[in-house]
């Protein structure tokens, strides 16, 4: 689904008219294709499509007219069918998405206008392969001009890839996978010593140690074949998931004890439902690893919306907030939570937005930035947005569109003068115009 054109389009590979497409992190796929091309003559390069198809390079997609060789493949409804029928679209999305949750996904095929899109499954790097990336001689400098995020990135390090949170609006697991691939402590320390500490401007602070979710480091699935769950921790914790926060604790303790290191911060955010499982982790987090502010993502307060988002119950956020504040007081810290909320997510009504607005008002939270949900390819939330259907249950979902999107976003920032008219109009539509002064004061 293409949000900008508001229509279902063919695979990007068809529209780009390329021979093949490489998706995700894809280091293995890229190396395989590069090695294959290097071995060919110029004339043979004209036949690369069939060569790539024969070798089934991971993280790669091709177009072909013949699929009989892919006996075990998952064949989806055709492009023509999903473009014409929203329920078919939702059903095909569910099949595609759940297949991608497996440890060993099948080849996925979609017929399209007399040809076939063939997508070869991803293959995660092993730990040693992942660590080898950080040994490569990257310059660690911008090619030209200033990059605003660079001041943060150059003094940060990546501890792992993958995320099993399963948030409906996020595509990270589609790119990096659901299963965590982490680096060893030795690999991370070596990078810090040899590549970060030697950079000009380094003052002893590591600004972030993390990945998509910092406190998923070292958490593994004990089930060899994996499963098709979208999330390992929602709506409940999977019994096959190793839930300990000990790997994160040990990593952070070791790094902050390195000579020349003053502080080690977590800047990439954590899952608070995981953090609450370990009192020692919470204690260490507040005492040593918050740089004044900690990013956290409750996203909403209404359970109906959180269910569709794949986020923990709001009571978990309140529990975390209470514990965070008590630990700050205990250790004499003045540190703050920066909560992220999304407006206009599928399933969110104006009533839901108003409840969130009054929660923020009651707790004296003034949001400087609000994300108005924007559909992005490959996510369950985008499927809901386009079809109005929850692909996992088949039930209809309210989808905020048009002016309602502006209303929902404005309700979360009623203090802004530019939003006054929108807030007034939204309240009038709800039959609650008398609340305008109370909300905007």
Model-found features: residue ranges?
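Glycine-rich beta-alpha loop elements in corrinoid/cobalamin-binding modules
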Residues: 1-40, 46-112
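Conserved, mostly hydrophobic/aromatic
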Residues: 19, 188, 296, 370, ...
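Terminal amphipathic helices with adjacent charged low-complexity linkers/tails
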Residues: 54-83, 97, 122, 180-232, ...
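N-terminal pre-triad scaffold of radical SAM enzymes
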Residues: 146-171, 203-208
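Conserved SAM/AdoMet-binding glycine-rich loop
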Residues: 193-338, 343-346
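Catalytic cores of alpha/beta
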Residues: 280-281, 345-361
């Amino acid at each position: 689904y293409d949000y900008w054109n508001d229509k279902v389009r063919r695979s990007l590979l068809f529209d780009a008219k390329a021979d093949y497409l490489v998706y995700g992190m894809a280091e293995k796929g890229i190396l395989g294709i590069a090695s294959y091309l290097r071995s060919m003559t110029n004339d043979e390069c004209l036949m690369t499509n069939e060569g790539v198809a024969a070798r089934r390079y991971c993280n790669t997609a091709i177009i072909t007219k013949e699929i009989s060789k892919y006996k075990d493949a998952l064949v989806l409804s055709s492009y023509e069918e999903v473009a014409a029928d929203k329920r078919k679209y939702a059903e095909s999305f569910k099949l595609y998405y759940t297949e991608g949750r497996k440890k060993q996904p099948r080849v996925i095929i979609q017929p399209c206008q007399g040809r076939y899109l063939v997508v070869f499954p991803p293959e995660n790097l092993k730990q040693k392969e992942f660590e080898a990336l950080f040994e490569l001689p990257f310059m660690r400098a911008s090619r030209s001009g200033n990059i605003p995020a660079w001041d943060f990135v150059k003094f940060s390090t990546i501890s792992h890839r993958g995320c099993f949170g399963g948030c409906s609006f996020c595509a990270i697991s589609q790119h990096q996978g659901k299963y965590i691939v982490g680096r060893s402590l030795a690999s991370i320390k070596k990078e810090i010593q040899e590549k970060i500490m030697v950079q000009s401007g380094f003052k002893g602070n590591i600004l972030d140690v993390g990945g998509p979710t910092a406190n998923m480091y070292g958490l593994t699935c004990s089930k060899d074949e994996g499963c098709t769950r979208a999330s390992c921790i929602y709506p409940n914790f999977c019994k096959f998931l190793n839930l300990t926060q000990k790997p994160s604790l040990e990593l952070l303790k070791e790094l902050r004890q390195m000579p020349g290191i003053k502080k080690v911060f977590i800047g990439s955010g954590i899952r608070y439902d995981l953090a609450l499982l370990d009192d020692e982790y919470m204690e260490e987090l507040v005492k040593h690893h918050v740089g004044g502010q900690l990013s956290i993502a409750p996203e909403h307060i209404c359970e109906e919306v959180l269910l569709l988002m794949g986020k923990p119950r709001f009571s978990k956020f309140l529990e975390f907030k209470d514990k965070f504040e008590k630990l700050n007081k205990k250790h004499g810290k003045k540190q703050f939570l920066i909560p992220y909320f999304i407006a206009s997510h599928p399933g969110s009504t104006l009533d839901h937005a108003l409840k969130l607005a009054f929660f923020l008002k009651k707790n004296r939270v003034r949001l400087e930035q609000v994300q108005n949900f924007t559909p992005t390819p490959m996510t369950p939330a985008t499927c809901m947005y386009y079809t109005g259907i929850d692909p996992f249950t088949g039930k209809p979902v309210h989808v905020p569109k048009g002016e309602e999107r502006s209303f929902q976003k404005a309700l979360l920032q009623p203090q802004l003068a530019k939003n006054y008219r929108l807030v007034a109009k939204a309240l009038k539509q709800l039959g609650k115009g008398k609340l305008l002064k109370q909300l905007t004061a």
